[in-house]
Regions:
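Surface loop/turn signatures of beta-propeller and other carbohydrate-active proteins
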Residues: 17-57, 76-79, 95-127, 159-188, ...
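Beta-rich accessory regions
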Residues: 27-31, 272-289, 297-493
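Entry beta-strands of beta-propeller and related beta-repeat scaffolds
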Residues: 65-68, 123-137, 192-197, 251-258, ...
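Short glycine/acidic-enriched loop and turn motifs that connect beta-strands
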Residues: 73-77, 140-144, 202-206, 314-315
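Short, solvent-exposed loop/turn segments at conserved positions within beta-propeller repeat blades
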Residues: 77-82, 143-148, 206-213, 260-261, ...
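A short loop-to-beta-strand structural motif that recurs across blades of beta-propeller domains
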Residues: 83-85, 150-153, 214-216, 265, ...
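Conserved Ser/Thr-centered positions that define the repeating blades of beta-propeller domains
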Residues: 89, 155-156, 217-220, 269
Length: 493
């Protein structure tokens, strides 16, 4: 009878999901041989044990765990076969990868999406012990004919298993503008007492400047039936949208909404639960070529708004050519704040304070001249680091910082890396922070007003830090922290 039941279950699944061999996606057990000790394994950025990852999905906090779902190919080192991978953390720093969360079904795969905790029990799936984690995702058809649509699933065991809502049928049908409309984000809007879903549905037409891209807002009270609320039309919008409310200058009585897309173009405005109105001033949240498809955590416990993105390499062979078992990784989590500047309200991004748990050895110098600093650093070996420096603008014209062969230049008030400028505010005090891992560098200038994320692979034998200048410089603070590996111990029960 046991074998008969198994046969019936598999047969039923196959009948419900034509074109997809579910068992072939159940590959996580084959990941058990990975030790996280590969030469190019990021040491403090999340990467999958094996195979390809891209967009972060469904980022949510629940009962002491941060959940990071992500686009994942469970079969190969390159993009394809999209499922939702899954990892959990108690501190957003140390991660444990779990079984693949949501697998393909029907004639399609599982593209990017979102997750939220259903505290109001709108879906009606909460139990006495657990609130439902509700995930929305794009069901991406594979035959190049059918339209993409938005579907959902829920979990009542803290994200360990999911059940499809309505057997995976469309909960938000294709809106008719673009076959590939995708990447829903849902959140609870307290003032209007409803769920809001934001969805990219149309790209702009380069040949017709007035034909703008389109984002559509929907509302729901049951997480199943959605009503159109409004549209948001902009030239810059393209996939992986997010919308989040932030305090301005930390003031709880002054809040603005931030909308951004996959390339981290953003605008600031107001949202009343029906429509979004912005100042129509478009800004770029990351100046590098790696940061993409970032999303914020829903339901963080301490009112921080924390964001993570995919650090994509333009050359996938960075990992493949070196025979790494994995490909791509995430950015280090960072807080987002809105602050008033002379040029208006701007977004500031800064690494989460939990990074301090990784510090292995710290070097703190205050009021130190550059020549003395170089002598102090000489002979020390640095690999993965968190570096912070501040200085007086009026006393500093130009210098270069040699960070294991990666050259950061400061000249005439701005920073430059790989010929890309990171502008700073016209303030007397200037600061910069640098996170260097084995394959990437993240640079935060002026408390995170200007951020640049890119791939930068230093030669293993180059472990030196130094400051290069034609004149003596004085740093108010120069701090270097050696960072240990997040894979050294499991932080999840």
């Amino acid at each position: 009878m046991r074998f008969l039941l198994i046969f019936v279950f598999v047969f039923t699944q196959a009948q419900q999901r034509p074109g997809v061999m579910i068992d072939s996606f159940q590959t996580f057990d084959s990941y058990s041989d990975i030790k996280y000790d590969e030469s190019l394994r990021p040491q403090f950025h999340f990467s999958s044990k094996k195979n390809w990852i891209n967009d972060p999905n469904g980022m949510v906090y629940y009962k002491g765990e941060y959940h990071l779902f992500f686009q994942h190919n469970p079969k190969a080192i390159h993009w394809g076969n999209m499922t939702w991978g899954h990892a959990v953390s108690k501190d957003m720093v140390h991660w444990e990868q779990l079984q693949h969360a949501i697998l393909p079904y029907g004639n399609g795969t599982i593209f990017s999406g979102t997750a939220a905790i259903d505290y109001p029990n709108s879906l009606g799936k909460n139990t006495e012990e657990e609130k439902a984690i509700v995930a929305y995702f794009t069901h991406a058809q594979n035959d190049n004919k059918d339209l993409f649509y938005q579907a959902g699933a829920f979990s009542t065991d803290r994200g360990r298993t999911f059940q499809l809502i309505g057997r995976g049928r469309p909960l938000v049908p294709n809106q008719g503008f673009d076959r590939g409309e995708r990447d829903p984000k849902i959140f609870w809007h307290t003032p209007s007492r409803k769920w809001v879903l934001i969805l990219w549905i149309k790209r702009s037409n380069i040949k017709q400047p007035d034909d703008l891209g389109k984002v559509r807002f929907f509302g729901s009270t049951d997480l199943k039936n959605w009503k159109k609320l409004s549209d948001f039309d902009r030239k810059w919008v393209y996939e992986c949208m997010d919308l989040v409310e932030l305090r301005v200058d930390g003031d709880p009585n002054n809040k603005k909404w931030l909308i951004f897309d996959a390339s981290f173009d953003y605008e600031i405005g107001t949202f009343d639960g029906q429509s979004l109105v912005t100042d129509q001033k478009n800004h770029l949240g990351d100046l590098g070529d790696a940061y993409y498809a970032a999303q914020t955590f829903n339901n963080t416990p301490d009112r921080r708004t924390v964001i993570m993105g995919w650090l994509r390499t333009r050359d996938n062979n960075v990992y493949v050519d070196h025979k790494m078992p994995f490909n791509q990784h995430m950015s280090f989590p960072a807080t987002m704040e809105l602050k008033t500047t002379a040029e208006g309200i701007r977004l500031f991004r800064w690494p989460v304070e939990e990074i301090k748990s990784l510090y292995q050895k710290s070097y703190l110098f205050e009021e130190i001249e550059s020549g003395v600093l170089n002598e102090k650093l000489k002979g020390e070996k640095f690999e993965e680091i968190d570096l912070y420096a501040s200085f007086d603008r009026s006393k500093t014209s130009s210098f270069q910082m040699n960070i294991r062969g990666q050259m950061l230049t400061y000249e005439k008030g701005d920073f430059y890396f790989n010929d890309v400028m990171l502008p700073t505010l016209n303030l007397n005090k200037v600061n910069v922070r640098i996170l260097l891992d084995r394959t990437t560098i993240e640079i935060f200038a002026d408390d995170g007003l200007s951020v640049l994320s890119t791939y930068a692979v230093s030669a293993p034998e180059n472990t030196q830090l130094s400051v290069l200048s034609d004149e003596s410089l004085l740093f108010d603070v120069f701090e270097v922290n050696k960072i240990g590996s997040i894979w050294s111990r499991a932080w999840v029960d």
